[in-house]
Swiss-Prot record:
The active site is at residues 192, 257, 286. The keyword Secreted does not apply. This is Alpha/beta hydrolase domain-containing protein 17C. InterPro entries: AB_hydrolase_fold, Hydrolase_4. Belongs to the AB hydrolase superfamily. ABHD17 family. Palmitoylated on cysteine residues located in a cysteine cluster at the N-terminus which promotes membrane localization. It comes from Gallus gallus (Chicken). Hydrolyzes fatty acids from S-acylated cysteine residues in proteins. Has depalmitoylating activity towards NRAS.
Amino acid sequence: MPEQGPRMNGFSLGELCWLFCCPPCPSRIAAKLAFLPPEPTYTVLPPEQQQEAGAASGAATPTGSGTCSLHLSERADWQYSQRELDAVEVFFSRTARDNRLGCMFVRCAPTGRYTLLFSHGNAVDLGQMCSFYIGLGSRINCNVFSYDYSGYGVSTGKPSEKNLYADIDAAWQALRTRYGVSPENIILYGQSIGTVPTVDLASRYECAAVILHSPLMSGLRVAFPDTRKTYCFDAFPSIDKISKVTSPVLVIHGTEDEVIDFSHGLAMYERCPRAVEPLWVEGAGHNDIELYAQYLERLKQFISHELPNS
């Protein structure tokens, strides 16, 4: 990174040159601004490797299951028992850009109609999110399907804007084909950077609903709040895609968000053709909305009473 100097909207002149000139293309800007993959907090063992591991340790391993197994590290902060962990299904899919995609299906609401296709934030992976998915799904009566972006967790490749879109396409297809979940029973849920692939997919496919948690208008508008239009070198132009989303959209944003200003959520809400009553969480920042009681209350109201449940 360049040395520090005079700053503009949180960026020094040197940082701006580094950001936009090395090289000047949206995908590189996107990677520098948005992607912070953590050290993986989990591993996934295919069936054949489970057999090998069991033989090496002398432990018995189940035969004939043909399923991958999930192994969490201490940094995953697992909050449940082995029983819940055993109910979490993990597997690999493949994207159109030929990256291996780590996928997770959390069956926490067997009687629920809807499944969330959850696109997480930029500094976590499936291992860190697993406990949250179980808690969220069981409280709002939804199963949860999620995936790690290219370059995150066990997913191969490098994080990029193009890979984001290919990743969620592969996740969408896996949820539909592997689990037989139809579009009218899928709720697309995006959080922070996860709203980018969510909006892109929702602008191309109709689904039961869309939830945008701390969304951004575009990458350039995050770095430069006074930006009023989308330039050719901008990244993540969700603000230009949201008008094409025909499904009901719930926007959630904290009024004191220090990462993606509240104005982003408001602008996205105003552009939605089928926006429902939003949730503006007074005093909440970027990473603590889930701690406020109205978060779960609004989700329950939206899913149980504002969407069809028969």
